[in-house]
């Protein structure tokens, strides 16, 4: 050990060279760890059909079979499958599924104990579906255009009668309220689960053992420097008191004698304690103490290097403010020791005091950094806020979820309940002879949202049948059924009836320029509930009057406090201001509620992740830039001082 101390005294550049070599080794280890980072072997994905999560290999993230519904999940950018599936067009490859017929619940029995549609309309709907399923186009390249025109032709041929149209619209409006309550409850539950998962993932980061060991070594190095400084003050205190004893005031000699007696008692206790230890251990401890006292600059350099290595190896995920503060304090300690090395004998007393204070603070910060290895797992208490009309409703629902819970069952299956007063509504609607055409009917919007395969481009549904895009029944009463090939060619019907709706005529010309690709009639079903695109839920609120009811129900429902109940006997005359505007929840919430909430034009693998984009505030930006910048500045200044020291010693 003495030979090593002699070599270090004669060749001080070796200390700096060792520090530089250690820094290079730590940087190389960090670069090697980043370069050899392994990719994930497995990935959690979400089924597009049943909305169930499962774990698949990373290479099969876009081509896998769901273990729950046995459906293949692998899509291209245009929404089609990324491989051919023969079972879609070959009947012998499909296997039948048999199940017992469930008993019809009592809630599905109507008030008048009859079906929703009459016998004639029910048969017409069956014929319409069969003819649409057996459609064969003239040209395969124009399949989309021909199926649109043929669907329009069937809708004009098989129309609903006036009472059935009234019953269907009333039932759809009632079911719309039930589904809206169910979707609200589902969205609130998913938001709460996502918040809990985010808090759990944020605060459950474990600290490695080697990182804790580096922080402990940093604290021990600083504690050793503080102990050496305190021992130096204790050794100098008798001489100071001896110079003061030459004064004239006698009481000071008495105080000095008392202090000397206390010091003697403390030294005796320390000697007794040291006598209990083995002599070899005491000798090694004294040798270590003497070596550290003679090379305090090396100890401080080791402490700084250990602190910076721990910060760099921890990574940006575990970067804390206390680590940045500790690195800055270590830099100040190194600066004071460098100043002492240059001043050598002419060291002022104030510099010693400042150095001791900085070293003590650095020791306390290092102890706090070594002890505080984990963050608190307690969740912050949610603060109640008042909802404003211009704000985002997602935050309001997160804090006030129980107040707006829908009174529907928590089961996954949804059983619609019959609308109230259906028989009275039918009698009232049969007595009316005028019909008010609504600008955008709800069946058309539901048909665009709940569709088997291709979403039609029809924007209006003013007639009395389930499919959208036809003329009102009052205007088409005298016109004969038109041939769908004449509609395809663009010719007008011979009768003086009105022309087809602009959406149908526009669909023939607008889709001709698009990419014509043959695709099956029944493609994977889509449920689009984003109110912004399809306008499934109307936003304006209009009062509903029972004194003069229109022949068909208005499309705008007043969303008041009783709108969530399954049975509503009558509507109030007042226009109640709802807690939220209809459709605003689905327009402002950018996060999809599940895989089935995405339309066909979504990109591939959009159903396997929930991306939440949020704009960080100025506090988050300050926290992300200030502390890494402070750490970088500390490291840069430290390397600059080391380079200057090496230059002046080797020159």
UniProtKB/Swiss-Prot annotation:
**Annotated membrane topology:** Multi-pass membrane protein
Segments on the Nuclear side according to the record's topology features: 1-209, 318-321, 374-625
Q: Name one GO biological process term.
A: nuclear migration along microtubule
Q: Where are the stretches annotated Disordered?
A: 469-525
* Keyword annotations from UniProtKB, A to Z: Angiogenesis, Glycoprotein, Membrane, Nucleus, Transmembrane, Transmembrane helix
Similarity annotation = Belongs to the TMEM201 family.
What is the recorded name of this protein? Transmembrane protein 201
- Supply the source organism for this entry: Danio rerio (Zebrafish)
């Amino acid at each position: 050990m003495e030979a090593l101390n002699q070599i270090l005294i004669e060749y001080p550049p070796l200390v700096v060279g060792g520090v530089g070599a250690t820094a290079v080794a730590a940087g190389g280890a960090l670069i090697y760890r980043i370069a050899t980072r392994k990719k994930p072997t497995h990935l959690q994905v979400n089924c597009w059909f049943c909305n169930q999560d499962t774990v698949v290999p990373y290479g099969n993230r876009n081509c896998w079979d769901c273990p729950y519904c046995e459906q293949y999940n692998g899509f291209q950018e245009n929404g089609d499958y990324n491989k051919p599936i023969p079972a879609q067009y070959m009947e012998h490859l499909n296997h039948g599924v048999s199940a017992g017929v469930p008993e019809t619940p009592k809630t599905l029995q109507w008030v008048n104990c009859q079906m929703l549609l009459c016998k004639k309309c029910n048969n017409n709907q069956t014929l319409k579906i069969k003819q649409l399923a057996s459609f064969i186009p003239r040209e395969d390249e124009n399949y989309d255009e021909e199926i649109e025109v043929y669907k329009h032709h069937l809708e004009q041929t098989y129309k609903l009668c006036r009472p059935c149209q009234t019953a269907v619209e009333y039932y759809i409006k009632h079911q719309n309220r039930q589904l809206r309550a169910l979707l609200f409850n589902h969205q609130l539950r998913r938001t709460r689960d996502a918040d809990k998962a985010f808090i759990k993932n944020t605060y459950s980061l474990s600290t490695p053992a080697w990182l804790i060991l580096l922080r402990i070594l940093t604290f021990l190095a600083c504690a050793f420097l503080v102990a050496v400084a305190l021992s130096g003050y204790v050794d100098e205190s008798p001489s100071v008191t001896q110079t003061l004893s030459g004064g004239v005031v006698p009481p000071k000699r008495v105080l000095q004698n008392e202090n000397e007696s206390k010091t003697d008692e403390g030294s005796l206790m320390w000697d007794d304690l040291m006598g209990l230890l083995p002599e070899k251990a005491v000798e090694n401890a004294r040798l270590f103490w003497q070596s550290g006292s003679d090379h305090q600059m090396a100890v401080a350099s080791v402490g700084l290097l250990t602190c910076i290595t721990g910060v760099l190896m921890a990574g940006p995920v575990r970067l804390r403010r206390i680590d940045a503060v500790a690195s800055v304090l270590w830099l100040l300690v190194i600066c004071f020791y460098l100043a002492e090395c240059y001043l050598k004998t002419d060291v002022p007393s104030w510099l010693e005091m400042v150095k001791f204070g900085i070293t003590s603070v650095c020791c306390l910060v290092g102890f706090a950094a070594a002890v505080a290895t984990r963050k608190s797992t307690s969740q912050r208490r949610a603060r109640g806020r008042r909802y404003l009309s211009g704000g985002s409703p997602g935050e309001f629902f997160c804090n006030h979820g129980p107040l707006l819970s829908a009174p529907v069952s928590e089961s996954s299956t949804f059983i619609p309940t019959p609308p109230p007063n259906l028989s009275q509504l039918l009698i009232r609607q049969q007595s009316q002879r005028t019909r008010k055409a609504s600008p955008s009917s709800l069946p058309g919007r539901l048909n665009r949202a709940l569709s088997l395969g291709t979403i039609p481009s029809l924007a209006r549904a003013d007639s009395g049948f389930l499919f959208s895009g036809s003329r009102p029944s009052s205007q088409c009463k005298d016109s004969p059924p038109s041939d769908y090939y004449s509609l395809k060619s663009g010719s007008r019907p011979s009768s003086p009836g009105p022309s087809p709706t602009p959406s149908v005529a526009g669909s023939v010309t607008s889709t001709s320029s698009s990419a014509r690709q043959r695709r099956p009639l029944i493609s994977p079903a889509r449920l689009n509930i984003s109110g912004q695109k399809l306008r499934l839920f109307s936003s304006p609120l209009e009062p509903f009057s029972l004194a003069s009811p229109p022949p068909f129900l208005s499309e705008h429902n007043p969303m008041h406090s009783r709108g969530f109940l399954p049975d509503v006997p009558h509507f109030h005359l007042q226009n109640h201001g709802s807690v939220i505007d209809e459709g605003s929840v689905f327009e402002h919430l950018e996060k999809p509620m599940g895989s089935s909430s995405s339309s066909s034009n979504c990109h591939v693998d959009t159903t396997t992740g929930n991306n939440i984009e949020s704009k960080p505030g100025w506090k988050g930006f300050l926290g992300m830039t200030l502390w890494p910048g402070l750490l970088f500045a500390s490291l840069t200044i430290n390397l600059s001082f080391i380079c200057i020291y090496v230059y002046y010693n080797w020159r």
